Swiss-Prot record:
Protein name per Swiss-Prot or TrEMBL: Decapping nuclease RAI1
Cofactor(s) listed: a divalent metal cation
Biological classification of the source: Eukaryota, Fungi, Dikarya, Ascomycota, Saccharomycotina
Gene behind this protein: RAI1
Entry GO MF terms: enzyme regulator activity; metal ion binding; mRNA 5'-diphosphatase activity; nucleotide binding; phosphodiesterase decapping endonuclease activity; RNA binding
Its EC number(s): 3.6.1.-
Length: 379
């Protein structure tokens, strides 16, 4: 019989101790769905002169020519690139990374958000594999409903367009003026990703997270931890009324969760009017967001501390529910958010999913499993 455990999302915890995030490596994902370890060719560099804000930049310009590569990805949330990068790191060290949970930042953000959003707006449907004494978590691919006219929604497109308008593919000294000036006319696409691989932790739980990085704010240091140089880019409606302000506070709270998880220190928001014209740009320090929220909305300010405590609660719960003492044990689980709780259910051998999760490549690649098994062979 399947073992099930529930965790009430309003359960209170006391853990507020966070480990300093540290970047151990990085990789790129191409529009052709290829993964390249230690490749920063997809990394962007932030550059927006003040004068360009007077140009009435259109965040919906070129929407009809948008190239959507994501729809061709077999599995947008695959761990393949993350596992390749961890394996390359372990091959140098000749030992496995000492962490409890390996997943993407987006997965942990969703789990944190379950304490603040309903399942309707924050769907959590994960598959977990216990392998080699570690917990690997992956999101189940969700078939997005395509717009009837096949076009991307303007608010979604405006985010991609903003990134195109405020970044370049090389550091500024190596970028021509022509390239910079042609940014408004450049065709927008998705699928190019630069992912940082970060070791972090909360309480007694150590995590390895993959996190897509929007851009470098200033400069990149070779062979060093570059977390302090990264920036998160977002767009939203201009804040004109108290109602707008409340909506923005909710948005920046979610962005803060994204950034504090992996130690990204800066957030830049582009504010657009109702016609999707970029009106202003504002920079926020990730560390100062809780103070900003507390001064404007005390309840939301407290949510930042509550988010960290809840992060500690659900990771501790997972570690307690999933036995990790014997590295030879392999198990599979599903983790979902429904009503007011997270539900963890063990997937038994009789279920169709079990074989694919344990012996197939739904979560772990055969290459990674073979690598880990080779580490156990006495040299």
């Amino acid at each position: 019989m399947a073992v099930t455990s529930n965790l009430f999302v309003k359960q209170k915890g006391n853990t507020t101790s966070l480990k300093q995030p540290k970047e151990i490596s990085f990789y790129s994902r191409t529009p052709e769905d290829e993964f390249n370890v230690k490749d920063d060719s997809r990394l962007r560099y932030y550059y927006l002169p003040d004068a360009e804000l007077d140009m009435n930049l259109d965040l919906c310009g070129g929407i009809k020519k948008f190239k959507d590569h994501y729809k061709n990805f077999q599995d947008p949330g695959t761990l393949k690139g993350l596992l390749k990068t961890i394996q390359a790191y372990e091959e140098i060290k000749q030992k496995k990374v000492k962490v409890d949970i390996i997943t993407f930042r987006g997965v942990i953000r969703k789990l944190i958000s379950s304490a603040f959003d309903s399942p309707k707006f924050n769907q959590v449907n994960l598959r977990i594999v216990l392998f080699d004494g570690q917990i690997f978590m992956k999101e189940v691919p969700r078939k997005e409903e395509e717009p009837k006219d096949g076009k991307i929604a303007p608010p979604v497109y405006s985010g991609y367009k903003f990134e195109n308008l405020v970044t370049v593919s090389k550091p500024i000294p190596y970028t021509s003026r022509t390239t910079i000036e042609k940014r408004p006319k450049k065709i927008v696409s998705n699928g190019d990703e630069y992912i940082s691989v970060v070791r972090t932790g909360v309480g007694n739980c150590k995590l390895m997270l993959g996190a897509e990085v929007d851009a470098i704010f200033d400069f990149k240091e070779e062979d060093k931890d570059n977390l302090k140089h990264y920036v998160e880019l977002k767009t939203t409606n201009a804040v004109l009324t108290p109602s707008d302000a409340r909506k923005f506070e909710q948005k920046i709270f979610k962005t803060w969760i994204q950034c504090f998880l992996v130690g990204i220190p800066r957030i830049i928001y582009g504010f657009r009017d109702n016609n999707f014209i970029l009106k202003s740009v504002e920079e926020f320090s990730t560390d100062e967001v809780p103070l900003l929220l507390k001064s404007n909305s005390p309840q939301l300010g407290n949510s930042c501390v509550d988010a960290i405590k809840w992060y500690g609660v659900f990771t501790e719960w997972l570690l307690n529910q999933i036995p990790r003492d014997d590295p030879s044990i392999k198990k599979a689980y599903k983790l979902v958010y429904e009503n007011n709780h997270l539900r963890l259910t063990e997937i038994t051998e009789e279920e169709g999913e079990f074989n694919e999760l344990i012996n197939g490549e739904t979560v772990l690649t055969n290459e990674f499993k073979e690598w880990r098994n080779s580490l156990k062979v006495p040299k």
